[in-house]
Amino acid sequence: MAGSKTPDRLAYRLLREYPLEAARTLEKSPIEEVVTFLSGADIVEIPEVLRFMNRDVAAACLSLWPDQRIAEIIASLPPRVSCSLCRSLGETEREAVLKACGESAAGSIRRLMQFPENTAGALMDPNPPALPSDEDVSSAREYMAKVKSSEIYYLYITNRDGTLAGVCGVRDLYQAAESSPLHQVMRKPVSMIPALSGRNAITAHPGWQTYHALPVVGKNEFLLGVISYRNLREIEREKSDQDNAMPLFFAVGEMYWWTLTHLMEGIM
């Protein structure tokens, strides 16, 4: 059809600008149709929709994509979201998805899956920036320069057994003498979140009054991960958006529903 590209562009624009409403609309369609529709979207648009979609539906979609597509999507999602999706899959489908993710991403997801849903252990970033306390500041600067993240606020200092010993702010790290061992420049004691803490305990933690991120620890204060304040707000926003989905539907109006549903039919 000569004008088919116009409705295609409109459909995917709606997908990009209204991911929550798109997620709720897509949930009403057969899984195979959803996969076909999303396969035509730009890779950066898919993760945002999956984040708001019913976990069972999103996980089923994920399991039907080719391995390369799965790997791209998982790489674009926070580990906590990927973990939640994998929990919704059967064991066979889950292992297939994890295999497609690659060893590094799969390892992160498996670590989160050891903890109950909605606990700090399941919501954390399982790859906190950390170095042993006997390393020096020069080594720490080199390490931090290689960390690929725009949200690094602190370097966590551990004992050689992996237990948390202290914390060092990035600014402090660059003001200290290069030859200083980390145990001399770190701050202690450290505000930390036990891995089995629930959402309410995480949100109410007094450490947020001082720090932009808090380490998550297991038995004997073994460092497991980190939750940043920005991620905490993001988690709460996702929950709030999902809880208030119906009022948002009415705000957007029936025209959105009609438009996206019929555009999907035209594309497929």
Report residues per predicted region.
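Cytosolic regulatory modules rich in charged/polar residues
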Residues: 2-23, 29-33, 41-47, 52-60, ...
